[in-house]
Design a protein with these regions (language model features):
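Residues that form generic nucleotide/phosphate-binding pockets
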Residues: 8-9, 255, 280
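Helix-boundary and loop/linker segments of multi-pass membrane transporters
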Residues: 8-10, 143-144, 297-300, 343
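Hydrophobic alpha-helical transmembrane segments of multi-pass inner membrane proteins, especially
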Residues: 21-33, 43-269, 310-371, 395-399, ...
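Long extracytoplasmic/lumenal interhelical loops at the membrane interface
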Residues: 265-319, 346
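Transmembrane helix boundary and interhelical junction motifs in multipass membrane proteins
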Residues: 163-168, 289-292, 304-305, 373-376, ...
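Transmembrane alpha-helices of multi-pass inner-membrane enzymes
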Residues: 19, 25, 373-409
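N-terminal membrane topogenic signal
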Residues: 1-20
Length: 420
């Protein structure tokens, strides 16, 4: 009876379920360890991690609901999800809530969330539907490329204004989906050339028109005082659109400089956390210091989010960090195996798009933690402490499990036919 009940709940590919639960286990351990600053502010050792566990439980419930949705309903929901994404992105651009200098959140029904998280899934959903609808024996029709660009046009710029790294991540995932969908190489080559030129132009504009926000801040000014001062400033519409240039320029300069920073110039919310993340990695070893024994978590303001992989390396060592990375690789290859068994193109493209989205974001986070790329602000999926992003990522896994169920049913039908 118990086995039957569990079987009805944990449907779909068992390997993906195992990967998900291992990631959640690592998340609970590391968020509890890395949330020392939050526990101090909350005056409770357990409050931050209990809130995180509650979000994971809600995410699992949403995941179970999603995996019971048949693939054809995802296809039917595409225009509505796209419309919702565009409306909420416009909403956040006009009247969104600002945190740490970035206007990325809106409040809906008492819940604060980032519309860009929904927009990522909406773009993957739309791209999968376009690629599947316009597939031919030789690959995707030329019209597929144009339709995908038409869908990207209203969404990517709205995301890019406040979250450049998310826009870049989304574009990379869509490009990989078009590769999988066999979009003509000539079109992809032209797109790649345009993107390279656009990125070069953007970097030039950022370096030319962005200001060094660190140099302009008064000495010894706290983050709270900076935030209050920012709120008092009256910014024009143009300044509100391009205000992130300063942040992008600062991050590029810091990444390229690689020079020692004088103690009086250290910003505990920016410079120090990168330095201490590097110290956390450098002082680790093969086995690590053990869960809960991090020495650098108190000096990294985003130890539970953007830089949690550095804390994982410090506490779990090279072996633990490699194990976590392998979980994402297993998720990607397992989803690829599921996609290869799908009878129709849409669920295959949809599942692979979601897997690429999650794994590419994880790769971004890991590269930031070890200093390979500038700080992006991308959390580590399923491990970093998050809000609605955690729940939405669980929905993405639920959608992959839904595809695995349909592929499994196909295999069972084929097996029954062969037996007959």
């Amino acid at each position: 009876m118990i086995n039957k009940t569990l079987g009805n709940i944990f449907k779909g590919d068992k390997v993906i379920w195992m990967v998900f639960f291992f990631l959640c286990l690592v998340s609970i351990i590391e968020v509890y360890s890395a949330s020392s600053q939050l526990t101090y502010k909350a005056s409770s050792y357990t409050a931050p991690v209990l809130k995180h566990i509650m979000l994971i439980v809600i995410g699992i419930v949403c995941m179970v609901v999603t995996l019971n949705v048949k693939c054809r309903y995802f296809k039917m929901a595409t225009p509505f999800v796209l419309l919702f994404a565009v409306v909420t992105l416009l909403w956040v651009a006009i009247a969104g809530a600002s945190t740490n200098g970035a206007q990325r959140w809106i409040v809906l029904f008492g819940l604060q969330f980032q519309p860009s998280e929904i927009a990522k899934g909406a773009m993957v959903l739309a791209t999968a539907q376009i690629l599947s609808a316009l597939q031919t024996e030789k690959g995707a029709d030329k019209l597929a490329f144009r339709y995908i660009l038409m869908v990207c046009l209203p969404i990517v710029p709205l995301i890019m204004v406040e979250n450049l790294s998310t826009a870049m991540l989304l574009c990379l995932v869509i490009f990989m989906m078009m590769l999988l969908g066999r979009v003509p190489a000539r079109q992809l080559g032209a797109l790649l050339g345009v993107v390279v030129l656009a990125v070069a132009l953007l970097v030039c504009c950022v370096m030319a028109f962005g200001t060094d926000e660190e140099a302009q801040k008064p000495a010894n000014q706290t983050l709270t005082e900076q935030t209050i001062e920012q709120k008092k400033e009256d910014k024009s519409a143009v300044e509100r659109v391009f205000h992130r240039f300063d942040t992008w320029k600062s991050r590029i300069n810091k990444f390229l400089a690689h020079k020692d920073v004088a103690p009086k110039d250290v910003d505990l919310d920016k410079d120090a956390q990168v330095a201490h993340a590097n110290i956390a990695i450098a002082t680790s070893n093969i086995m690590g210091k053990g869960p809960g024994n991090s020495e650098e978590r108190d000096f990294v303001s985003q130890a539970f989010s953007d830089f949690i992989y550095a804390i994982i390396i410090e506490e779990m060592g090279i072996l633990g960090a490699t194990g976590v990375a392998m979980l994402y690789i297993i998720l990607l290859f397992r989803t690829g195996r599921i996609a290869s068994r799908c009878e129709n193109n849409f669920p295959a493209f949809f599942a692979m798009g979601l897997a690429l989205l999650l794994v590419t974001q994880a790769l971004f986070n890991m590269c930031v933690a070890v200093g390979l790329v500038p700080v992006t602000g991308q959390p580590l999926p399923f491990i970093s402490k998050g809000g609605t992003a955690t729940i939405i990522n669980c929905v993405y896994i639920g959608a992959i499990l839904s595809v695995s169920r349909s592929a499994q049913r196909k295999q069972e039908i084929i097996a029954d036919t062969n037996v007959a």
